[in-house]
Structure formats: structure tokens, C-alpha cells
């Protein structure tokens, strides 16, 4: 049959071993640790389940689970999920860590939203000169640089477990290493509390984007304590036995961990059947929820409800630790077919350990555990199997003596605790007592464990080993099938010696036994009435065997105490001969009012404290010491009444003579104290209902508690699930023998009375400690019935135990190597006097059971459970992958962050806007004419604008000199033939600007150099182009003088006869008509206008034009006319620019002869001639002054470089607008978007600056466009079609709705809505609907393509570009680019 398991139910068995400590110290430790543990912050909760990438479980220090961090681990969350916004003023940080790299790394860090400043953190530095530093970061609000508050130099920590604590208190920082103070450093800080902004982040194993080294290695504990005293309290040597983990390093403790095999066999039905008694619900400590979470149990944890704890420790540093990895498998074994039929009530536990169980002291706390599955126990008998457990192969036991019985009492009291109910859906109202038991007894080594003197038969109990009773109800329905046909299961062991306790303080031993459920063994039925007799002052056990029913009839009479022995030495000499048995001690009786013990019955659970059996670490027996002085009253027991002292027993046989010791003062026995006040009945809390187990989903917001569904039919047996979280404390109930005083008062009056099934009331609060009672009278002498031989004498004091335990290789304790600890036995001591009055009594009887409470709400999700088995693969313990959770609603807008750091160098800026028209310049001074020698002919200059004609010396035809005319300025000597000269107009130097207003005529400039001879064909062509409209009729001119002959011109003629002026003629083809009589000079004509060119974008001012060539009849030009409409370059522009040589050759047929060509790529100059091109030689370079604006492009079309099919070529730039384009391919979340937009815009010939349509860590999306142009300019595509009315309208909160019929083009002219190059029609933006950056959804500032990281994007199918959809950053989506300002220079 496959093993049966209940969902959410787990059988766990752990053994508790510890080092001796007094009971007051144990009690004090528990209180301190409970106080210190409240409100601590466990930072390992950041890791979560399932584990992140590069994080895994490993076996950690002491066998606990730990987390292994690889190089790629990235654990971080918003700090507000774990850390309070206002941090503790004083605090402590506890760490258990094992680095695997010499580079150190950050253990944890709380940073600002930009992950640049560490507010609080711990870092390990790299290894330098055999040391490392532990660095504490503590940065107060307002600082923009991480501050190192303290740094401690420690030895290299790599590849070994290290335990340290950092304490920040007042003006000091203290480092504790292995519970010892390492050093202190002064710490200056302001009185202002450390506060974290709401957008702060907390990281584990790294520090975000700060650039600090990541931690690689194993991390087991990382806890922040609000009380800075907590680490010191947990490390107190007096409290080490109560600690839940070792304070020192396991490697250096020297305590060998020997894990004993535990087997279970079915024993004879004659073995004792023990009925467990459920303890009342104990208050749940904060650590109960952590027992199966995979976390180490914090120090000082003593209380538990679902398991007993193995504590073992080094004698040097003394704190125990829980071993939760020693149990290899826990599974059921088929029971008796008769009792198992269908109900499964007879399932056994078969616990097989393949490892050695750590054992540094003898003893197992008996842990009765009652578990309930989904059973109705009203009609199910609970008799049946009994499970006994024992450990094997220890070589020697330990015998506690009288001076250590107080510690023994504390040990036994704690180990008997942890009786727990594990509620499922069970009602225990009808459970018949004493039927189904699984008990485990750990027997001593070779001899049965004894505690004090007894009658010749005794009870196996506390000191060496106690028993564990497990009552189970697994999935039982009220079938009525009896389960008492199963024989008990008994596990035995073969030790060499027993662990016994000698006579001692009865008060302490009574306190020990009252908290320990003792179990009878034999064939007697449970519930039989105890034998009559005097009160039982002290529970005892026999050294060798179980008590039989016949022997029980003779117990109850007191024996006389042995004679007083002399004080022995310290026990450090050589071992002496064996000591004979001492005199008979007092016998056990029935109805021992203070012992918490009754025949055939169990006792109450005690106060609920769980104390390890450290008291059993003792040496071999030494000589008995004298009776000590009366000690101070011990800490009151919670459920014990001390019985009256017994009469002295008969003298036992004399022991071997020991060294004589001084006689001690006899002690005085006190009377029994008054019974304590009965506690008030407490109200029972509601039972919690178990919610349906859901598949783990992605991390989402916590949902409301789920409702419990109806029970379905039994399904197929599935694999065992991981351990569930601890349930709430169950209600106290009367089970087994039906005790009403489950607090352990020892009442045995109702042992044999069957109890009616009724609801169980919750246990009332514990009463306050009462005043010390008066000294009692000496009790009556008991009957002089000889008791069994007394135990051996007490051991010597252990002084060098830690050094002697290093080489232990077998058994619980191997003292063969410690001969110096064994002293010779001493003489028997005299009986002591009555002791002091007893302390206040225990809590009163339990009230009547209350009615069952309502089902509680579903509990919170538990921590990850510890994996206690190696039989089941890890993947079977983990649930199936959950469905993705719902996306959470966008969070509120965060507060305005602090000023950012200085950014990187920006992209090249756009050209500046044209300046305003300058003020009208003043008239310049006349130029000084300096006649110089004629220079060499210069290279041909570029064509210039027609110059103003200042002097007309003559026409191209010879004209005789007119003597009545004034001589022109700077003309050649009269009568000498020369070429036509022209004088330029002196102008003001200005910057590039808009067309200016009409300026005043400048003064006459200096005479220019002679020009080259003109070609007639060129001249005719040029004059035809310069043909103007008909001028006004001129006045009749006077007869001209005979002109000189100009022999340098090819065309000349004789002077004509004077004629009358004729009427105005039609427009002629030539400038000069036939020669007529000279007329009067005509007035200047109106300015001429050229034929308007095709409209085009405004171009820069052209270079100077060719020289004006005028005929004799041309009048002086008028003032400059208004600027004409801009046009594309026409054939009349004699200077044209091409991109390169190929472009010039392809367009040669479009260029007329005489046109100058400038090549942009090579900066060369050519002139078009008849058969081709001729290259012109240019002079030296004259650099442009630094303060001059850059020259405009020679072409007036900024988009002419786009390929022919590009729709941008037809874009209309006449109206101001901002252009929106897309990158030429899709991109994932890891992209240098701004650089791509700039680069692709330049490649497309767009001169303005384009920015990515994305939010960034430095800028919100809504602020990319220049502020002055967010409201006035439309947003258009590259064809000029309007997409949005203005930039601000996109961020109105409606998602940026646009007309889907207007396409969005890429820089290379493709429509992204239809082109298959963008398979996912989704646009990245990473912004809220109002254009605010969302740091959790913008692919880590567009620097990652990780699948686990998301960014916001908008599907084009919605007709919006700001729709709020989250996509994985690994997707390749559309990236848009926006022109961030209107650039007029690029479009002139």
C-alpha cells in the first residue's frame, strides 16, 4: 500500500541534545529571546518562492537550509514591502554567511529610486593581505553620496561559515564575531531618523545599479533586530543551552556529530500501551511559523508545538542548534490488515535514518503528539499501535549527581514539552481514551535510566531517555472500526551503560518530572487505578527493567535515607573502584500531589517550555560530596506540588573509602507550600479553516482569502507535498486518560474514570507568582520498608570538557579518554534536613471544555518548508507552475526625485534660428583710391549679382569722346583703348538673416582689376537673357562728339549721321541700336523683375552673380527692388552645386555653357565648356571667423538625399510642424534609442534633431519637445499629414488617440502600419497616459532585453500611441522618433 499522507500534514521527529545549564538560566533565556525576536526583519524573505535565477537551496551551517547566490543572482524589491519607511534609531544586524569569492560583495542594500545612493547596507570587501573588511553603509536623508559609517577588518571569510552581528547603538557601531566583541567604532550621525523614500529599493546580494561587487556564496541568516541588545542576549553564555542555534562555528567546536540509526519494529502486545495527554494550546511564538520554512530557527527558541528539537552544542560556546536534515525519510508502513481495512487508522511511522544523529548528551524528550487529519473521531477507538523509539550504539551513559539535579530538572522539564495538536478538520469530542498510541522510548545504554532511588521495580523515564507518544487521526471517517488490534512498535538499542540520576534535591527533581510525561511499561492496561499509599515525594525508576503489574502492588512505601557521606574531592584524580549501591531511598506512592506522576498514567505537559537535556553531560561517578547549604528557592514549577519529605531509608552497603571531606552543614527540609490559586478560565479562540491550496502564480498583489470548497471524492494518491506552515494552536482537550488538570498538578483521582466527550475549553491565563510560604513542619516518618539499592554517587565537576570531547567517535558520550575526570567514590552522606518551603503551586485545574469555535479565516502563506526527506525528488515537492497573475493597477505617481547627476555629453545641437534684422547701418566713408601697378590675372571669380553701374566709359562699340561730359572717376587716360570696367558697390558685412529692407546706396568703391576679354557667343547669350522691358522714351539728345576708335573690339563702325529721334520701338534683340545723333541723357528707368521661379523652400543667399554687361544705351540702374519669391535653381543661376562627380556628369546636358559647378564631397570647382568641364584652380583657404554662423547649404531642399521612392521627398515644409517618424527596424528593450534616431535622421538628410519617443530615467516623455512648441505646432508624418493637433494633446490622459488612416512612416519611407518588417504592430513608450516615466515598466531605462523585465507599449490596433500594455523587454517592437523643435534653417 502506498504511504498515506494528509495534505498540509507532516510527521516530523527531531532529537534534542544540549549541554547542562541551571533552570533559572533557561527560563531567563527564553524570556529574553522572545522579547528580542518581536518585530525582527528577516531579509531572506526577499528571495521568495520560486527561487529567482542563479539562487538555489544548499545545505548550510549546522545542516540548516541556506541560499546559494550565483554571479547572475538579482534579488530586489521595493523597500516598502519589507522595511518601515522610518527606520529604527538603534538596531542590530545578524549574519550567517559563507562567501565563495575573494572579491567579497554586497550582502544587502537599501537604495534610492535611481539605485545610486545606499541608505543602509552591508558589504564585504575584497581580500587584501589576508584580511577583509565588513563595511556598514548608513546614509542620512538629503545626502546624494553613499556614506560608509563603519568598516571592521576581519580574517579572510572565504569558503567557511562566518557568524557575526553589527550593532548600531547611540554613537557607536559594534561588531560581534562568534558572539565575542571584536571592536567598536565611533559613529557620528544627526538626531534625524533614517527614513526611506517610497520608491526606495532593497536588494539582497547586490546593490542595484551602484556598480558595487555582487555577492557570490551562501547566505543562511540575514536579520535586522530593532533591539540592538538582541545579539548579545542570544549569545549570553549562561543562556546558551536555550539557544536554537550554535553561537560558534561548527568546524571549530570539536563536538562530533554522531547520528544514530532509528528503526522501528512491531513489539509484543505485552509492551506498555501509553495514552498521550494533550497539552493545552501554548502561545504561539514568532518562530513557530518558521520551523519548516527552510530558515534557521533563531537563537533562544524554546517553544514548539509540532516537533521536538535536537539541541547539541560545543562545551566551549554552548548553544544548541536544530538539526533538521538528519531524518532521511518519514513514511508509513502497512499496519494490521484487520484494523487497517479501509480506514487507515492503523498507519505506522517508519523512520529510517541513513545519517548519524548528533548526540552530545543522552536523553530524548517525550513528545506526545496528537494529530488530526480530516477525521470525525467521535466513534473511532484510539487504541492500537504503540511506537517506541530508541537510539543505538552509545558506549557510556552519564549519571547526574545531587548537585546537578536542579539542572536535570530543567532538562527533563523542557524535554517533556512540545506535546501538540495538529488540527485538520477533526472533532475530538468523542475520542475514547487510551486506544491509539504511537510511543517512542529511548532507553539507556545497557541499563534502564533511573532518576533517584525507588522500590525494587521502577519506571523507565526522564534522565537517560523519555518517550514520545504520537496519537494520529489520519483521514478517519466515523467508521467504527476498532484499531486496538495492533501490537505496539518498539525500537530497542544496545548501549553499554545507562544514564542514571542519583539522589538529590527533591524539589528540583520533582520539578523535572512534573513537566515530563512518564510512561509505564508492562502488560497492565491503561487507566488502571493507582495503588493506595502515602503521597509520592519523588518519582524513581529501577536500574534494570520495566515495572510489572505485580510489582506495582508493592510500591508506595518510603525507605530510609542512607547515612551522610563525607565531602569528596573535585573528581579530577584517577578513577577509583566502583561504588556500591547506596541505601534504599524513599519509595514512590500513589496520588503524589506534587509530582505530576501517577501509576498507569501520564502527567501534564508542564509549562510548555522545551529545554534540552544538557544536564546529562557529566563525567563518570565521583565521590559523593557533603550536603550543601539550603539553596535559594528555585523558579516555581508551573504544575507541581511538592509532596512531604519521606522518612529516612535504611543504610545501604558501605561504599569504597574515598578521600575524607569536611563535614557540611545539614540542610533543613521545608514544609510543603500552600497550593496556588486556580487560574481563570480563558476563552477559547476560533479554529481556523483551511483554504484550498492554489497553484503558485506569478507575483501579484495579495488577494482576499479564498473560500473553502466542498469536499470532493478521494483522488489518486499524489506525491508528497512540501511541509506546510505551522497551524494555529489547537484547543485544549481531554484525551487519553481524561485528565482535567492538563497543567500537571499530579491529581490521579480520576485516572480510571472514563471521560464523557465534550467540547474543550481554552486554558486560562497562568496565575501570578505567589508569596513565599511559611516554613513547614517535619513530615511523618514513612514505613520502614527497605527500598532498592541507591544510585551511584554524583559525578565530579566538569572543568575541561570541551578539550576532552574533541576526539569522541562513538556513542552518546565516550569518556574513555577522560581518566582525570573520574575520582574515587566517597562514603555515603547523612540524610538531609527538611528543605525550605516550596514555591507557589501550579495553575489550577482546567475548566470545563468549551464549545467548538467557528472556523477561522485562511492563514497567510507559509514560508518555504524544510525538505526532510531524500526519498522524494525535489521536483515532486514543488507544485506545478501557476498561471500568470493579473497585472496590477498602475501605482500612483511617485514624488519628485532629487536632482540627477550631470548627464553625458549631448548630441550635436541644431543650427541656431535666424537673427532679427539688424539696425540700419550708417553710411560709410568714401573709400581711398590708391592706384597700384596692374596685377597678374586672377582666377575667374564666381558669378556675382549685377553691379550698379557708376560710370559708363563707353559701349562695346567705339564711341567718340564727348567733351561736355564729365570725366568719369578712375577711368583710363583719354583716348587710350581699354576694356570695359565696372565698379562694385561697397556693402556692409552682416550675418545670415532674413531679407533686409532697402538700403542706402553706398559710396563709389575702388576700381576693380581689368576683366578678361569676353567671348562673343557667351556675350550674345547673356545679353539675350538680360533683355528687359521697353524703357521710357528719352529726351532728344544733343549731337555727340566724334568718338575715338577702339581697336580692341572686334565690332566697330563709322559714326552715323545725326537723325531725328524716332518713336519708341518694339522690344529689340540687342542692347544697342544703330548709331543716331546723340541725345540728351535719359532718366533712370524703373527696376526690372525677373520671371518668378517655381515655388520651393527658402534657400540661402546665392553667391555673387556674373559682371553686368551693358550697352551704350543702358541707363543707370534704379535702387534694388523688393525680394522676389524663392524658387528652385534655374538655368539662369550660373553657379550650381552637385554632390559628387557622378552627379555632375549625369546632369551635364542640363547645364549650359559657362556655368560654374561646385562639388560638395571634394570641394572642387569646375566650369562648363562646350565639350565638357574644365577644372578651376582655387586659391588658398581663408578660414571663417569663429563667431560667424555656419554657411547654409547650397541646395534649398533639405530632403534631396532621400532615395527616389521615399515619400519624404514630397513632404511639405512650408508650414511649421514637428515630424514623427519611426526607426527603420524594430528593437527590443535594450537600445540606444536617442542615438539611433539621430543617426537615421541624418542618414535621411534631416538636419533637425530627433529624439526617441520614450521615457527615460532622466526625462519624462512629455518634456522631450521644446516647451515653447508643445502647444502651437502640429505633429505630422514625414509627408506633412497631421497626426496630432499639438504635442500636448497626446498626453491628455486618453492614450494619444490618432487617425489610423494617416500612416506613420519610417525614416526610409515605409509605412509601419502595413510593412511586414514590423511583425508586432506595437510601439514602445514606457510612460503613463500623462507622459510620466514609470520606472517599473521601462525596461530598466531601456538597457535590458531580459524576458523577466517588462516595459509599457501601445498596440497600433487601438488607435493610440500611449495605451498601457506591459510587454516583455525581449520583444522587438516599434520605436518612434519625434522632432524636438521646429528648425527653420534646415528648410530654407
Swiss-Prot record:
Collagen-like domain residues: 619-680, 681-731, 823-865, 879-927
Region spans: Nonhelical region 10 (NC10): 1133-1388
Organism of derivation: Homo sapiens (Human)
Region (Triple-helical region 6 (COL6)): 984-1013
Disulfide bond sites: 1237-1377, 1339-1369
Start and end residues of each stretch annotated as Nonhelical region 9 (NC9): 1108-1117
Triple-helical region 7 (COL7), as annotated region: 1028-1045
UniProt cross-references to Pfam families, sorted A to Z: Collagen, Collagen_trimer, Endostatin, Laminin_G_3
Region (Nonhelical region 5 (NC5)): 868-878
Record region (4 X tandem repeats): 358-555
Region feature (Triple-helical region 1 (COL1)): 556-573
Subcellular location as annotated: Secreted, Extracellular space, Extracellular matrix; Secreted
Composition skew (Pro residues), residue ranges: 528-540, 620-630, 716-731, 827-840, 1075-1107, 1117-1126
Annotated region described as Triple-helical region 4 (COL4), given as residue ranges: 823-867
Compositional bias (Basic and acidic residues): 766-780, 1029-1044
Descriptive protein name: Collagen alpha-1(XV) chain
Family, per entry: Belongs to the multiplexin collagen family.
